[in-house]
Amino acid sequence: MSTFSQTVPELVAWARKNDFSIQLPVDRLAFLLAIATLNGERLDGEMSEGELVDAFRHVSDAFEQSTETVAQRANNAINDMVRQRLLNRFTSEQAEGNAIYRLTPLGIGITDYYIRQREFSTLRLSMQLSIVASELKRAADAAQEGGDEFHWHRNVYAPLKYSVAEIFDSIDLTQRIMDEQQQLVKDDIAQLLNKDWRAAISSCELLLSETSGTLRELQDTLEAAGDKLQANLLQIQEATLGRDDLHFVDRLTYDLQSKLDRIISWGQQAIDLWIGYDRHVHKFIRTAIDMDKNRVFAQRLRQSVQNYFDAPWALTYASADRLLDMRDEEMTLRDEEVTGELPPDLEFEEFNEIREQLAAMIEAQLNVYRERQQPLDLSVVMRDYLTQFPRARHFDVARIVVDQAVRLGVAEADFTGLPAKWQPINDYGAKVQANVIDKY
């Protein structure tokens, strides 16, 4: 998020001095959203008191509140919002009794979050990234040209601080809103499954696929522009090397690099977490279907046994010959691997099986480093592990090793801001970029 120039005591004293207080019950929040919606339809951005009362009357009807005291309650709500600095009131001697109201920046910020920011748009994100790329390219070119302190402030620092950083904050806010929407979708799915899971299957599938598609769309757009943005930031950082007077530019560049890395990293992590949740829901549905079938069969069998003397029956079973997979003799003579596509369920079970076994074994072996307080070099440890598995398993094993290693501790070198060197971990070109973990 944006960095603040004020300290915590200064902000606390400022809030106390101005007596800031916000209380927005659901009906008042709905009233504020109605004001913002109607205000957006006006070119001048102004509303009269009568228009505010009409908006309040509509909200009051929606909440089934009394119609007899609408005018009085509307007047109280308007005065309360003016007092909370959500609305500004303007009066004049020429038009006494007819005040003009405008939303304050605080009111716009609250309504913008609830109305505009919740509307995810790939086009909007693409335009934001396009603007960021243009601003970064211009700043990188200005940094390569060099100049006096005024040149660096105007052509490098200002675009980074007041354009790039703000757009990064907007993208970060979009991700946080997506996090909240994911939780709402999970709640909706839980309610659907608790009511009637048979009727809820199609609705759950729709919610899962829509959320997965939105997350993937967001991440693909970010990754497509991420490398280019990082390259421009590195150019600016290289231009400031050896210049002690440009520490403010170097610090801002480092903050932007960290923010961009965090945005892209969290986007991928959110996708991984959602995939895990998606599989969990499908596993629950499959289990529910199996349990339901077994329950129906057991109930019918119990009734048949109880009513045997009234309605005798006979049980017939068949044991068919097993089907053998016969392959062509020519295929056995070839030295090619004959494979086929596994169903997604089997692939998931196969991955879970190896993950559970390896995770426990790797966790026990890596704990030795923490107990002995020995530095843990991921490149060396991963190379030793990967030699024990076929090439097809290298990615899964490496991922498990990294997951278990980062739980043990951190590398002090990560706090220096310098990137780690790429180290090979197998004989097929795979590499890892990680500092030595030395703080547990």
From Swiss-Prot:
Ranges in a coiled coil: none
SUPFAM superfamilies in the cross-refs: MukF C-terminal domain-like (SSF140570), Winged helix' DNA-binding domain (SSF46785)
Function: Involved in chromosome condensation, segregation and cell cycle progression. May participate in facilitating chromosome segregation by condensation DNA from both sides of a centrally located replisome during cell division. Not required for mini-F plasmid partitioning. Probably acts via its interaction with MukB and MukE. Overexpression results in anucleate cells. It has a calcium binding activity.
CDD domains given in the database record: MukF_C (cd16337), MukF_N (cd16335)
Record-linked InterPro entries: Chromosome_partition_MukF (IPR005582), MukF_C (IPR033441), MukF_C_sf (IPR038198), MukF_M (IPR033440), MukF_M_sp (IPR036141), MukF_WHTH (IPR033439), WH-like_DNA-bd_sf (IPR036388), WH_DNA-bd_sf (IPR036390)
Family: Belongs to the MukF family.
Any one Gene Ontology cellular component term annotated for this protein: nucleoid
Organism: Cronobacter sakazakii (strain ATCC BAA-894)
Annotated stretches, region: Leucine-zipper: 208-236
Chief location bin: cytoplasm
Self-association and partners: Interacts, and probably forms a ternary complex, with MukE and MukB via its C-terminal region. The complex formation is stimulated by calcium or magnesium. It is required for an interaction between MukE and MukB.
Keyword terms of this UniProt record: Calcium, Cell cycle, Cell division, Chromosome partition, Cytoplasm, DNA condensation
Cysteine-cysteine disulfides: none
Stored HAMAP family: MukF
UniProt name for this protein: Chromosome partition protein MukF
